[in-house]
């Protein structure tokens, strides 16, 4: 992709919605696959009372809409202003207690795990039915739209085309707290192909530092997968 085309794909614009200022892509198709659309606000006439504590709205008890779920709350139940990066808000926005908790948890992904994904890690990568793995660095592109694999060959997989992600583990019973991520199985569609393609990433057995980096990358990818599925289910 030429630098000019890439710049147009990554271009953003500042828009004002009823919820606040948002920095969104010029073209919707080039948005982050982890993003969420703004919710439809519950109409004022349909919520005469707070949807949390049931307080009746009047001149003193004012009505507020949560910017994440769109429901109506009183000030006491919707007083927190929290960053909401999945909807591209420039400033922290008003959210109800439940939504604020979710947004706080997502902030860790954007502040820490996203940086791990973009930095990348080294894996042994096997494409399709090949029996020979290739040592490659796998990372998330800066615009969050592609997985980039670099080694003797170069591959880019659009996140939007990923259909299955399975984190591979080793250890004792899953959920017992003693397993560790060792790899990832990925299925994705290829434009023009009937069947889905697949690849397997496995952490190498070389330097311990490289293994730790790979484990951190896999943990971050596990969180990213959850956000990806949430965005698709919206």
Swiss-Prot record:
<keyword id="KW-0967">Endosome</keyword>
<feature type="binding site">
    <location>
        <position position="77"/>
    </location>
    <ligand>
        <name>Zn(2+) 1</name>
    </ligand>
</feature>
<feature type="binding site">
    <location>
        <position position="96"/>
    </location>
    <ligand>
        <name>Zn(2+) 2</name>
    </ligand>
</feature>
<keyword id="KW-0968">Cytoplasmic vesicle</keyword>
<keyword id="KW-0965">Cell junction</keyword>
<dbReference type="InterPro" id="IPR052113">
    <property type="entry name" value="FYVE-type_Zinc_Finger"/>
</dbReference>
<dbReference type="InterPro" id="IPR032031">
    <property type="entry name" value="ZFYVE21_C"/>
</dbReference>
<feature type="binding site">
    <location>
        <position position="50"/>
    </location>
    <ligand>
        <name>Zn(2+) 1</name>
    </ligand>
</feature>
<keyword id="KW-0479">Metal-binding</keyword>
<feature type="binding site">
    <location>
        <position position="99"/>
    </location>
    <ligand>
        <name>Zn(2+) 2</name>
    </ligand>
</feature>
<dbReference type="InterPro" id="IPR011011">
    <property type="entry name" value="Znf_FYVE_PHD"/>
</dbReference>
<feature type="region of interest" description="PH-like">
    <location>
        <begin position="107"/>
        <end position="234"/>
    </location>
</feature>
<dbReference type="GO" id="GO:0005925">
    <property type="term" value="C:focal adhesion"/>
</dbReference>
<keyword id="KW-0863">Zinc-finger</keyword>
<feature type="binding site">
    <location>
        <position position="69"/>
    </location>
    <ligand>
        <name>Zn(2+) 2</name>
    </ligand>
</feature>
<feature type="zinc finger region" description="FYVE-type">
    <location>
        <begin position="44"/>
        <end position="104"/>
    </location>
</feature>
<dbReference type="GO" id="GO:0008270">
    <property type="term" value="F:zinc ion binding"/>
</dbReference>
<feature type="binding site">
    <location>
        <position position="53"/>
    </location>
    <ligand>
        <name>Zn(2+) 1</name>
    </ligand>
</feature>
<dbReference type="Pfam" id="PF01363">
    <property type="entry name" value="FYVE"/>
</dbReference>
<dbReference type="InterPro" id="IPR013083">
    <property type="entry name" value="Znf_RING/FYVE/PHD"/>
</dbReference>
<comment type="subunit">
    <text>Interacts with PTK2/FAK1.</text>
</comment>
<dbReference type="InterPro" id="IPR038632">
    <property type="entry name" value="ZFYVE21_C_sf"/>
</dbReference>
<protein>
    <recommendedName>
        <fullName>Zinc finger FYVE domain-containing protein 21</fullName>
    </recommendedName>
</protein>
<keyword id="KW-0862">Zinc</keyword>
<dbReference type="InterPro" id="IPR000306">
    <property type="entry name" value="Znf_FYVE"/>
</dbReference>
<dbReference type="GO" id="GO:0005768">
    <property type="term" value="C:endosome"/>
</dbReference>
<feature type="binding site">
    <location>
        <position position="66"/>
    </location>
    <ligand>
        <name>Zn(2+) 2</name>
    </ligand>
</feature>
<dbReference type="Pfam" id="PF16696">
    <property type="entry name" value="ZFYVE21_C"/>
</dbReference>
<comment type="function">
    <text>Plays a role in cell adhesion, and thereby in cell motility which requires repeated formation and disassembly of focal adhesions. Regulates microtubule-induced PTK2/FAK1 dephosphorylation, an event important for focal adhesion disassembly, as well as integrin beta-1/ITGB1 cell surface expression.</text>
</comment>
<dbReference type="InterPro" id="IPR017455">
    <property type="entry name" value="Znf_FYVE-rel"/>
</dbReference>
<feature type="binding site">
    <location>
        <position position="74"/>
    </location>
    <ligand>
        <name>Zn(2+) 1</name>
    </ligand>
</feature>
